[in-house]
Regions:
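Structural alpha/beta surface segment adjacent to cysteine/selenocysteine redox centers
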Residues: 1-61, 166, 170
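C-terminal cap of thioredoxin/glutaredoxin-like
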Residues: 42, 46-173
């Protein structure tokens, strides 16, 4: 992607975000390693606060230009969504959730994820990039339609399941 193409993509994302009431400030975004932020997302999940923490991190990054690789900033953001400061600090001081984040990274590699956003539905359908709602709706409908199809099975008298369909015919017992 050329610089001009990247600038155009950023402008399109900024316009889409603005249409949804979000402010993206690419001029103030600070780069940095987000590994610790992802570890705090796992802590937040354990407290039932993962969506709030994710939204807070995104706003801090894209709207406020905060350094989310900075541990004191991360602790402050965590407490703003209701996480105990001591627990957030303990995660950052140790290696808690490091394995979970590495597992997430490995799963992302298996999916072929190279950027965000990236949406996966039912573990097998995906779209990359900021997409309009109708694209995401098609993704969800496809995953739902495929997951709601039944595969008949018969249970033998010994309790073992076996496929009840062979070719074009199925048996019922």
């Amino acid at each position: 992607m050329t610089i001009a193409e990247a600038e155009q993509a950023n402008q399109q994302m900024t316009q889409r975000a603005a249409a949804d009431g979000l402010e993206f400030r690419f001029d103030i975004i600070r780069g940095g390693n987000t590994f610790d932020a992802h570890r705090l997302l796992h802590l937040a999940r354990d407290h039932g606060l993962q969506p709030q923490m994710k939204e807070r991190l995104l706003r801090a990054t894209f709207t406020e230009g905060l350094p989310i690789a900075d541990p004191p900033t991360l602790v402050r953001l965590a407490t703003q969504v209701g996480l105990p400061a001591g627990q957030a600090q303990a995660v950052l001081d140790g290696d808690a959730y490091a394995g979970a984040v590495r597992a997430d990274e490995q799963q992302a590699a298996r999916y072929g994820i190279t950027g965000v956003p990236f949406f996966v539905a039912d573990g097998k359908y995906a779209v990359s990039g900021a997409q309009p709602p109708e694209v995401l709706l098609r993704l969800l409908r496809r995953a739902y339609e495929d997951s709601s199809q039944l595969t008949p099975v018969a249970v033998t008298t010994d309790g073992n399941s076996q496929s009840s369909c062979d070719g074009d015919s199925c048996r019922t017992g």
